[in-house]
Amino acid sequence: MVMKKYKIGYTSGVFDLFHIGHLNILRKAKEQCEFLIVAVSTDELVRKYKNKAPVIPYEERAAIENSIKYVDKVVSQNNRDKMSAYMKYNFDVMFVGDDWKGNHLWIKLEEELKSKGSEIMYFAYTNKVSSTLLREVLNKIKEE
């Protein structure tokens, strides 16, 4: 068995309307760590910061994540405080989409995690697929 770079990895998201982009992130994350924790945003959290409810309820989104072979543990994400997640799960690396790279809040988080011996690894998003795009297509179909 090949040793992976990290012992515990962590990623989080809504994972609404699960698609190949989600699967790619989970696969890439698992390639880097022995144990992958996936935090799925609760319906309340999504409503709070996106001002809309997810299409798929939390329990079903968590069940989907739990059935994926790359995922070792599913937890609920009740807030967006990544340092509290670090304190709770003590991960070696956090996996994040590269659209956050360079954002001042994430630069600060990188520094905080580094001081604890953890880091952030950014992954490129899969082109031309997102839950938002899927939602738009479904709405167009519904209108026809």
Task: Annotate each predicted stretch with a short phrase.
Residues 1-144:
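Nucleotidyltransferase catalytic core that binds NTPs
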